[in-house]
Amino acid sequence: MEKNEPTQSKYDAALAKYNTQLDDAEIAAQAARIIAEKVPANNTPEVKKFLFNCIDLTTLKSEDSDESVMKFTQKVNKFDEEFPDLKNVAAICVYPNFAEVVKDTLEVEDVKIACVSAGFPSSQTFIEVKVAETAMALMEGADEIDIVISVGKFLAGDYEGMCEEIQELKATCKEHHMKVILETGALKTVSNIKKASILSMYSGADFIKTSTGKQQPAATPEAALVMCQAIKEYHELTGIKVGFKPAGGINCVNDAPVSYTHLRAHETTLHL
């Protein structure tokens, strides 16, 4: 009697279409080579002005309050007066309970309201809580939602559990952009970063993002390289173009052109 072969899950089948067996040392060498050869050409005032306009200006502190978030938002309102030669930031990013404060205070057009949600930064709570928090953030005025993958589920090989959460949260977001944070510092290997990138895009991410900024290492050149490669390959295979957002570890103005260089090399849409 023949034994039935185990059925491959649709998530394993999705991963099988890509090379996810990457070597950490090779990726590190490739990232270093790209930085040495191409970053100097992108380290220009024009590029830095473009990158500034991609920033999500963020306050995610335990001591945030209505008053502090109002003052934070006023900085964006006054930006054009103080820096007339620069375009404003892309978004203000806050905890979901401050979405309405930003909405009521923000006076400038073309600056979005982004909220972290779904148990940020650990993603360790019930899916019902994640969905409710996300829905409430949108109801209070959020234009974009940032969530974190269930890293524990991913590392345990529970791709179905991780992906179904992302899919349910994207269904809640509907037409609103949803950025999916991989928390690359917790994934340890570039192979895991590649797999998490593909699974997140497969599950409906509009952008994939390196990290919460709460854990180190964060937006490393190696993580940026692998994520941008994954985005390019996913686009070539599906026709769906997903954006990229580096976060955490970008500590000064000269760090940003590194991520921009990987973006340009892989024709990727950027959010900072």
Model-derived segments and spans:
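Charged, compositionally biased N-terminal leader segments and the immediate start
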Residues: 2-51
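Hydrophobic faces of well-ordered beta-strands that scaffold small-molecule active sites
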Residues: 53-55, 90-94, 113-116, 145-147, ...
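Conserved, mostly hydrophobic/aromatic
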Residues: 56, 102, 137, 180, ...
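Active-site mouth loops of central-metabolism enzymes
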Residues: 57-65, 116-129, 155, 181-192
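Glycine-rich, proline-tolerant flexible connector loops at the mouths of alpha/beta enzymes
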Residues: 60-63, 82-93, 147-161, 212-219
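Active-site cofactor/substrate anionic-group-binding motifs, chiefly glycine-
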Residues: 87-140
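Active-site-adjacent beta->alpha loops and helix N-cap segments on the catalytic face
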Residues: 96-110, 125, 152-169, 189-192, ...
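Conserved small/polar residues in nucleotide/adenosyl-binding loops
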Residues: 261-268
